[in-house]
Amino acid sequence: MQDHQATNESFDIIVIGGGHAGCEAAITTAKLGFSTALFTINLDRIAWQPCNPAVGGPAKSQLVHEVDALGGIIGKLADETAIQKRILNASRGPAVWALRAQTDKREYSKRMIEILQNTDNLSLKEAMITELDIAKSEQVGLNSKKVVKKRIKGVKTFFGSYYSAKSVIITAGTFLEGKIWIGNKSMSAGRSGEQAAQGLTQNLHEIGIKTERLKTGTPARVDKKSIIFDELDTQPSTAAGKYFSFDPDIKNNMPQVSCHITRTTSKTHQLIRDNLHLTPIYGGFIDSKGPRYCPSIEDKIVKFADKKSHQIFLEPEGINTPEIYVQGFSTGLPENIQLELLRTLPGLSKCKMLRPAYAVEYEYIPATQLQTSLETKEIEYLFSAGQINGTTGYEEAAAQGLVAGVNATRKLNKKDPIIFTRESSYIGTMINDLITKDLKEPYRVLTSRSEYRLTLRGDNADRRLTPLGYQIGLIDEKRWSAYEEKMKLLEEEKLRLNNTRLKNTDEISKKIELDTGSKIKGSTTLKELLKRPNFHYLDLIKYNLAKKNLGYSIQEGVEIDIKYEGYLKRQKNNIEQINRQSCKSLPQEINYEKIDTLSLEARENLNKIKPKNFGDASKIPGVSKADLTALLVWLKIREINKEKTNIFCQKKLSS
């Protein structure tokens, strides 16, 4: 980029992309007092939900709770625009409980635009960014070698406008060189109806950032009026009173609707088998990897050939639209065959397809090129967040957007970044996975990915992260006061339950014994009662032993804390033990190739990722416990040798 380029405007921070990551990043930086510009190709499609019109689900809901606990937006908007809510995994333990909301996608986007337009320090710009302006400077590094430092200076648009910035956050989603496929036909697009971002990928390569290619897909939409609902199972809203947000002022005034369930048939499966060669993947037109945990219907038929039927959900896209999202039925088959397939499903034999399913392949930045702060290793003050980092899902994107936004502001303020660890949050689990693992398929957060899932529940996200959100400056005084009041009530109730004792001769004790079939020997506290597997806080209410007017979230928190007290203490001890070892730092100048005591795979992977500490090193594929022990010994020898050298130099200087 030429130095004489005239500057249109200057900002502290520029965000490239108006999806869920971009919106969280821009709102975060603007709220923290930094002049911010959000650039997007289409201002009418801000925070769009191009795939399923839903927020939450297993592990994803935990992410949404965490973003909200820190002061983010996605949870509030999901609550306000929800047209159906359900608790998933309700019959299992609290570690895997998950809230899922069906949202009105147009209302969600509309409200996000309103928030952006009314946020101080934030400007919205419709433009395609094609080039990043990088400043280079030579500095003296280790061993007196000259090192070229690169720093972001600004951005250039397709039509030649230049905007300077102290920091840039890329949140381009699936738009970098995006291409959508239906059968063997393709066109350049970031998603259906929207042009792909051209030029920026090549520019990233020129400045030293590698990109690779991934694939995802979305199902067809059908006309609600053409569905025979009598042939379907109904799935009503069952958790309208549950919220992602911990903000007590959040309300939902949307009508609640039902989703419906159908299933694939033998005709569906045969039609897919007969036409596999016409799909982009099985036909060999593309070879990009798609999401493992959201496979196309053809993948399901091929990989699970023994299954006679697959469940399909029909989900409304909003209150004022006839469009129904056919969840679990994404495909890359030609349009005419898609309609044939849909009509093999019960309830859809006369359906009209409003939008065809399609596959989309796009460029992404392998996140091993990022630091834990989401700043790129190659270029200072350049951050990357969202689907461009190889993730899939609005929730994963929103969480990364908030992290990148926070750390971009801290970098400009010369403060250390906020590092989210695996032990503290699902956000930390996700980021650690992204930057330490060589992922070859879109990444989805899962409860099974966390070693600490009982500690990292959705219900306690505020207890884990709201103090940090307040410290950062994203939680206002009103919200902080509500949090402090909740903590006070929670601790008071746990103390009351511990101190309130029932004798087995009390009338209420006899009633409890009769109802539960469990004896009270001598006496017991309410806390001990609550520890029983089949006794819950609702039972305390039933027997008039509960504190009156205590909110549901406090009742739930108290019960989980008490019922799982032993497990939680054990997990806390494990975390503290790991932290003592994992915090030991690893100098960035180490050349692991020269450490002979490490395995070859460990040397290669450690050199590639350059972990900051033992905790990060322990999570790198191919690095065994034996490698970590060898590395620890090597560091001790290195420190001893350094001390000897220093003593020798001091003696030489004094002689």
UniProtKB/Swiss-Prot annotation:
Function as written in the Swiss-Prot or TrEMBL entry: NAD-binding protein involved in the addition of a carboxymethylaminomethyl (cmnm) group at the wobble position (U34) of certain tRNAs, forming tRNA-cmnm(5)s(2)U34.
Protein known as: tRNA uridine 5-carboxymethylaminomethyl modification enzyme MnmG
Record text on subunit structure and interactions: Homodimer. Heterotetramer of two MnmE and two MnmG subunits.
Family listed: Belongs to the MnmG family.
GO BP term, pick one: tRNA wobble uridine modification
Entry-linked Gene3D superfamilies: FAD/NAD(P)-binding domain, GidA associated domain, C-terminal subdomain, tRNA uridine 5-carboxymethylaminomethyl modification enzyme MnmG/GidA
Organism the protein comes from: Prochlorococcus marinus (strain MIT 9215)
Keywords annotated in UniProt: Cytoplasm, FAD, Flavoprotein, NAD, tRNA processing
Signal peptide: none
